[in-house]
Amino acid sequence: MWLTFALAICLGVVVLYVPGYLVGRAVSLERFASVAAAPAFSVVALVILGVILNAAHVRCDGWMLLLACAALCLLIYGACRVLRGLRGVDGRTHLTRNAVDSEWILVALYVGVAAAVSLVVFVHAMGDPVSFSRNDDTTVHLSVVRGFLDSGTFSTLNVTKYLDLGESGGYYPAAWHVVTAVVASLVGNQVALATNAMILVVCVFVLPVGLLFLLRQLFPDNKLALYAGSLFSVAFCGYPWGFVVFGQLLSNLLSFALIPGALGLLISSLNASGPSKSGFAVAYACNMISVALAQPNGAFTLGIWSVAFAVSHLWSKRSDGYWSGKRTAIILCFIACAAWVLLFVAPPLQGVVTYSWKSTLSIPKAIVAGLLFMFTNREGVQPFLTVLVLLGIAKTLKDRRLRWLSVSYITAFSFYVIDVATDGFVKQLLTGFWYTDYYRTGAMTVLFAIPLAALGFAWLVKLGTGLLGKMRFGRQGSNNSCVVAMVLVVLLAVC
């Protein structure tokens, strides 16, 4: 059974990365960017094909949907290569051998650390590959996947728990379920096993690799922060593990995991030039769609992060024309706020934005709980992460280019406090897109805290190295940094 589970994990990686990688290369992304964007491309292709086949009254097995997806992505890759050849455009990105080697070393580090943590936190507690949580949301997830498999239809426009019994369904953000059904079809339709495998694929591969791609854009000259980032992709209880022990919120798990890579693509698109610039823009748009297909509130989470970065980028941009950077940034803020209000009053979303969870904490307690990353009673206090995030915020105050990271985090933190400690119109307006669910707004806060934690860890290592060098009569070097880093890793593990 464990060998089948390992096979399911490998198949999950293939399903998410192989088809999408071809599309990434087709739109002129360099290899690592194509890997980071691959899950989003694959998700969009699988969901669209599922809808089209169902509309055409074509029933198929999950592995057949995967073959169709691979064929479509291969066709896109071939067509783009031919078009570039006819136009005489070289869409390749040339990197030095050292840069390429460094990228894949970091990928191995991020995936390795996430795998080690996941083995301890998830696999050890799981007990058996076919175990499953007996929560209400989990039974729905398993039933939807089973319905896809038994009915031979994979349309997110026709989702119900009883699809295999002929019941007509409706729209549901079921990207997670489509992907899981495809994986399950390759391992004997074992739904629970495929679900557990996909949880690991998201936590060990999708989230860490996307985070690495984002941090490479944020900290291009801070190697220590890049290496430190490997410690934090799955270090917080609030996300991803909060979504695994509560609900389970598996659609949100995938949606949020796609967000770091998507933001990295936006940053790359604004900094790139040549054919890759449009490629990054296409990849970002596709990532936004995939995030929404997995769970729409993820699109709002990505929107907050994206607008914060875009405003910061425009504000610092020098221009003498009428459309100066600052003027454009202000207009973008107004457009974002107007779009928020329009979506809040949109009839299709009323069932979501009017749903309300009652407040459970006072405002002071909510602030303390949020600072300690104990967003609910199912999660633990993590004081060392608090220190690192606060140090990261302090560091951004010294770097105007990164201040938007702190603004985003404070915004998400405020949403969580309002969500868990108040009731009324303001709560619905600000957090209604997340069902006023403080598990989800808390997870958003965690997501925005991860880069700050990496930045704070790197800064603390530098401070500790300097202090240790002075204590050792001025001798400084890489050994001091290693000692300090090891001490901090131990503190992270126990605190």
Which positions does each model-derived feature cover?
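Membrane-helix boundary/interfacial segments in multi-pass membrane proteins
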Residues: 7, 56-63, 130-134, 188, ...
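Active-site lumenal/periplasmic loops and adjacent helix-entry segments of GT-C-fold
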Residues: 106, 110-257
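Signature aromatic-anchored transmembrane alpha helix within multi-pass, membrane-resident enzymes
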Residues: 330-337, 459-495
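Membrane-interface helix-loop junctions at the exits of transmembrane helices
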Residues: 45-49, 119-126, 151-154, 226-245, ...
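Membrane-interface transmembrane helices that cradle and orient dolichyl/undecaprenyl
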Residues: 259-280
